[in-house]
A protein has these predicted regions:
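N-terminal glycine-rich anion-binding loop in soluble enzyme alpha/beta folds
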Residues: 1-56, 119-144
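Periplasmic-binding protein-like
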Residues: 9, 70-80
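General beta-strand structural signal in soluble alpha/beta enzymes
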Residues: 37-39, 77-78, 97-100
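Short, well-structured alpha-helical segments in soluble
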Residues: 55-72
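Short, well-ordered alpha-helical microsegments
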Residues: 83-87, 104-105, 125
Length: 144
């Protein structure tokens, strides 16, 4: 079986190896042909959750995508529902770059019907509203 070197970009800076590698371990469990290496972007201890953190984080995602491409990775996954830097990274490297938001919304669309979202902010990520237009369950008001 062929194997693929997959880079996972975490948009939350952490020194905790369990947290850093959590998504990569799941990917390797469900896709045994993946050899995953997870890295976090620097100086984003509050992750990417608003315009200011997006402006600071996107260039870091793109720089890490370039570095991973230069190191021979076969594909990159940006592990965040907001897909920060995904479009920009796709323009910067000639390998597949997949965002957590786009991939999840596309899978929900494939299965059809309505979809709900749960997130770290009250906002629904752009990829969800773009891909699932008209098929998102209205806000339930939890936590208000």
């Amino acid at each position: 079986m062929d194997s693929y070197r997959i880079g996972v970009i975490r948009v939350l800076t952490t020194e905790d190896p369990e947290l850093l590698n959590l998504h990569g371990r799941l990917l390797e469990r469900y896709f045994p042909m993946f050899r995953v290496e997870s890295r976090c972007i620097p100086d984003q201890y509050e992750a990417i959750h608003d315009d200011a953190t997006m402006a600071a984080g996107v260039p870091k995602v793109v720089a890490m995508a370039r570095q991973m491409y230069e190191e021979g990775f076969d594909a990159i996954i940006v592990s965040c529902a907001g897909d920060p830097g995904v479009r920009e990274a796709r323009s910067a490297v000639p390998i597949p770059v997949v965002g957590g938001g786009e991939s999840t919304a596309s899978l929900a669309q494939f299965y059809g019907g309505k979809a709900g979202t749960v997130g770290i902010t009250a906002d629904i990520p752009e990829a969800y509203t773009r891909i699932l237009e008209g098929h998102i369950i209205p806000e339930a008001g939890i936590g208000k």
